[in-house]
Amino acid sequence: MRKAEISRKTAETDISVTVDLDGTGRYDIRTGVGFFDHMMDQLARHALIDITLRCEGDLHIDDHHTVEDCGIALGQALTRALGDKRGIRRYGSFHLAMDDALVRAALDLSGRPFLVWNLPFPTEKIGSFDTELVREFFQALATHGGITLHVDLIHGVNSHHIAEAAFKAVARSLREAVEPDPRRADAIPSTKGML
């Protein structure tokens, strides 16, 4: 079973997350940050990963700790659910168009965390949500999920569309990478013999 549950409690956040890599994209996300919940819904739906996420954060300060720590916990849950990564495709990439926005995401579940980020936003906020937190989330996800992740904006003028296209592009890339490879069902997808 490719499932995992993570609980993470700090002075800033109290998080529980469960993932099922062989799900259907069901989600139940409650972080207290409306726009971020909407983005996480998109991530689950388009990755076909069932995600339940609860976060009690210090939102009286700002959204930063909540968003970043959810990325940390989700990355840890993905790592645990993938186990030794035997039989997965490992790589994924996707170009996602959403109205004016076109975003490319490519990733490798290599165990070597790295983020290449070329996603400038035309505004600093989407409603009350700081657009810089999109990068913070993906940095935390990549670092704690052991993911090499590239996200590039090819075109876009609307910050909401850019953010949503990024979450969906990463989701579709993740969906491809975690998918079992029927031709290599028992193999680690690396010439090193481990990831």
UniProtKB/Swiss-Prot annotation:
One function term, GO molecular function aspect: imidazoleglycerol-phosphate dehydratase activity
Name the record gives this protein: Imidazoleglycerol-phosphate dehydratase
Domain of life: Bacteria
E.C. no: 4.2.1.19
A UniProt-annotated Pfam family: IGPD
Enzyme class at the top of the EC tree: lyase
GO biological process, any: L-histidine biosynthetic process
Organism this protein belongs to: Cereibacter sphaeroides (strain ATCC 17023 / DSM 158 / JCM 6121 / CCUG 31486 / LMG 2827 / NBRC 12203 / NCIMB 8253 / ATH 2.4.1.) (Rhodobacter sphaeroides)
Keywords: Amino-acid biosynthesis, Cytoplasm, Histidine biosynthesis, Lyase
Pathway entry: Amino-acid biosynthesis; L-histidine biosynthesis; L-histidine from 5-phospho-alpha-D-ribose 1-diphosphate: step 6/9
A GO cellular component entry from the record: cytoplasm
Entry-linked PANTHER family: IMIDAZOLEGLYCEROL-PHOSPHATE DEHYDRATASE, IMIDAZOLEGLYCEROL-PHOSPHATE DEHYDRATASE HIS7
Reactions it catalyzes: D-erythro-1-(imidazol-4-yl)glycerol 3-phosphate = 3-(imidazol-4-yl)-2-oxopropyl phosphate + H2O
Annotated family: Belongs to the imidazoleglycerol-phosphate dehydratase family.
Places the protein is found: Cytoplasm
